[in-house]
């Protein structure tokens, strides 16, 4: 069963593409028809692609892969931030910084600076600074937070990118392609699908469409993390069962060892009895 329904996609306006004169011919396989100069996306393919992307994300996250949400267009900014936070992943929703992936070492130093400044602003030492210096530091912190706030805690480049509108996020796409990082993206009729690994053909301008698709990808990540926890619990249970089995085996071994010792002792007693008791009986017979 699909994770979204045809009705949900229609109500969200996911089928509306761009004007026919603005289309990318490579999107032809994903277009159903054209009406009043606007391309209509084939939602059957959208349904299938959402399911494929969902399964890919879920399974990847179960393998401890990390995801970066990217959506800097106005309609997507808040949705991307909210859903990325909900599923505990990273996001960029203000501006893609060139080199974020290909020159991550430099970006990482700026992320570290953001975290250090955040701690400093909350310290007593900061409160003792002149008001003017405090204001300057706060402005720098706000600027860093705006561009890098969604990357806090990111220690290495992400394993997967999920992008809203790859045409707008062209630099992010190029960097990911260069590093062979898989990309999932909502792809409208004016985009190039060839640079995307998991194409979700859909209207990438409508807020309701963006909300629907982004929330489903976040759900996939949450499900993957829950599956990872369940797997860990199952493996933990298996380990406990194995430990219990080992304990039982040890107890049995101890009992067998004790029985063997007892049997050996019994044999020794029998030998002693055979050796000494008959002669004692003979001596007693002689007395009588």
Swiss-Prot record:
Gene Ontology MF terms in the entry: structural constituent of ribosome
Q: Which GO terms describe its cellular component?
A: cytosolic small ribosomal subunit
Q: Where is this region: Disordered?
A: 267-288
- Kindly name one Pfam family recorded for this protein: Ribosomal_S2
GO annotation, biological process: translation
Q: What's in the keyword line of the UniProt record?
A: Ribonucleoprotein, Ribosomal protein
User: Which Gene3D superfamilies does the record associate with it?
Assistant: Glucose-6-phosphate isomerase like protein, domain 1, Helix hairpin bin
Family of this protein: Belongs to the universal ribosomal protein uS2 family.
Question: Protein name, please?
Answer: Small ribosomal subunit protein uS2
